């Protein structure tokens, strides 16, 4: 038996974000895994499932929801806790796939993992998939690209990705908070930030383009100089998260040149 494991980029909440290649891959899947965090509202998992279902005309795909194991932080270094966390998630994937393969006569199984944005930008899913491949014999991995939150952000605001001849950094909120603004960098894109880490930057000459729920009916856009608009972003983010129980957001930071 061979297993084809697809990490499928599905954009950010709108089926129109899904590429033709991703749609064809979804249709070809026998099993699609949908993860959700413990105590998380089902809406975010349902959103992923509904995006996938919009490309499936017959009930030929089995959807399996699972609770994503929690990452254990106390008494562990960050990297070690992430490694253990990936091991736990991989074991969950393996158990689900094994159970499915034991119940089917198929010799070739296509398993899909829908990923927000583009799977190439989130190394966790790739590392987890590699663990699955090492555990289950005759397993292959393929990434199916999707529209990333950064692409949707610059499109929503109608701004360029970069400045002419200037460098760009894509980082996480945790690293922005820990390391600050790197020398020689003019533009920063921040993902996976639950703390509005731009508030920890000491430089006041920074402009921000912040977006939440890109492509969804709740899409929210705020832009302005960080000292003037930062508190509004924090308040808006907290309100949106409280209302929906979850949030997907991203932002661009750029240093201002004062005359």
Which sequence ranges carry the predicted segments?
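A polyampholytic, Gly/Pro-enriched intrinsically disordered region
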Residues: 81-92, 159-172, 228-243
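Class I S-adenosyl-L-methionine
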Residues: 2-139, 223, 229, 248-258
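Class I SAM-dependent methyltransferase SAM-binding "motif I" and its flanking Rossmann-like core
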Residues: 117-184, 241-244, 257
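A generic structural motif
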Residues: 63-68, 143-146, 209-217
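General beta-strand structural signal in soluble alpha/beta enzymes
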Residues: 34, 113-115, 143-146, 163, ...
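Flexible, charged surface loops at secondary-structure boundaries
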Residues: 1-2, 24-28, 105-106, 164, ...
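Short gly/pro/ser/thr-enriched loop/turn and capping motifs at secondary-structure boundaries
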Residues: 39-42, 148-151, 216-218
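A contiguous loop/helix-start segment that scaffolds small-molecule binding in enzyme catalytic cores
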Residues: 5, 182-259
């Amino acid at each position: 038996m061979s297993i084809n494991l697809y990490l499928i980029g599905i954009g950010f909440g709108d089926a129109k974000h899904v590429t033709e290649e991703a749609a064809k891959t979804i249709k070809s899947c026998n099993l699609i895994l949908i993860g959700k965090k413990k105590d998380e509202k089902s809406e975010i998992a349902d959103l992923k499932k509904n995006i996938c279902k919009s490309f499936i005309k017959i009930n030929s795909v089995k959807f399996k929801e699972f609770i994503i194991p929690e990452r254990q932080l106390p008494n562990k270094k960050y990297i070690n806790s992430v490694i253990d966390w990936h091991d736990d998630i991989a074991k969950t994937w393996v158990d689900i796939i094994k159970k499915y393969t034991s119940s089917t006569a198929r010799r070739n199984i296509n398993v899909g993992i829908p990923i927000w944005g583009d799977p190439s930008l989130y190394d966790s899913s790739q590392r987890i998939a590699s663990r699955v491949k090492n555990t289950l014999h005759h397993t292959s991995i393929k990434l199916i690209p999707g529209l990333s939150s950064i692409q949707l952000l610059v499109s929503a605001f109608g701004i360029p990705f970069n400045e002419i001849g200037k460098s760009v950094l894509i980082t996480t909120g945790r690293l922005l908070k820990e390391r600050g603004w790197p020398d020689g960098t003019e533009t920063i894109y921040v993902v996976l930030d639950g703390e509005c880490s731009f508030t920890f930057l000491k430089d006041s000459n920074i402009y921000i383009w912040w977006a939440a729920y890109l492509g969804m009916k709740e899409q929210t856009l705020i832009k302005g100089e960080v000292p003037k608009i930062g508190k509004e972003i924090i308040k808006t983010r907290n309100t949106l998260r409280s209302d929906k129980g979850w949030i997907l957001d991203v932002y661009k930071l750029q240093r201002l040149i004062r005359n």
